[in-house]
Amino acid sequence: MIKPMLAHKFDINRVDYTQPDGYYIQPKLDGVRCLFTANGAYSRNNKKFMNLKHIEMALKPFFEQQPDVVLDGELYNHGLRYDFEKIISLVRKQKPTEEDRRNAQHLIQFHVYDYFSMDSHYEKYQTRMNNLVNSDIYCASVRYVPSYKVHKHEEALNMHHDAFLSNGYEGSILRDGSTLYKHGRSYGLMKFKDFSDAEATIVGYEIGQGKRTGTLGKFLMMDDDGNKFGCPPGKGFTYKDMANMLKNIDNYIGQRATFTYFQRTNAGSYRHPLFKTLRNYE
């Protein structure tokens, strides 16, 4: 089973901006993690994606030359950054129709930010980044996620992170240039963003009131610690979407879901929780 490298939350005590290989910052994409191989594309939990034929064809020449390489990135489209469910609906198709494939070709891109192989396990990120920059794999459906070298935290936070947020990205990823690719969480890869993601189980719902009559008002959710809370649909969901959610509410009850929140209180409750998507695509 292929496992990607995962980020820890940012910890300033683990950063040394003076180390020789440097630190690099990237925009954090709010997409679907994807590992692309010569045999197809897989989720972080090893579920094969079946609706990415256009990307498979674009990468075919690369994998014919380097069949042992695994490209690490995100299925994403910045134009759909407020419509995550649209990406999910196309990515999760296990028996895509021709229309599904056409829509995926038009909307789904693979944004590459790292790679690994048997030969590259001893390559530092700085080397891997330079190899990606000079690769000829990029096209309309395969994009490179740029990295910017930073020399101090104020530069990373005030210049790049703020710019990423202003441009609609969900945060930043800080990479240690000396880090080898690790399968699992690594402090060589740290994330900082204003909102956090978490998972919980949908246990109930409330109907919308006022102008949202006839739609889903909020899901009632329970996290793994037994905390119950209300969670309205977040950005990107239209009245039609929320009406369909209410109509098909039985398909949601009991499901695991991803939600975003701003902070946790001392009592453990979530501030501004918003439903993002069902966690059934990985």
Q: What is the predicted role of each segment?
A:
Residues 75, 112-117, 146-149, 176-178, ...:
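Short, structured patches in soluble enzyme cores that scaffold and shape functional sites
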Residues 1, 147-196:
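Amphipathic alpha-helical
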Residues 15-140, 281:
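Covalent nucleotidyltransferase
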Residues 26, 32-36, 40-73, 181-282:
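Classical nucleotidyltransferase
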Residues 4:
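Short, Gly/Pro- and small/polar-rich lid/capping loops
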Residues 18-21, 29-30, 106-107, 166-169, ...:
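Short, well-ordered loop/turn elements at secondary-structure boundaries
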Residues 133-141, 165-170, 227:
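Secondary-structure boundary elements
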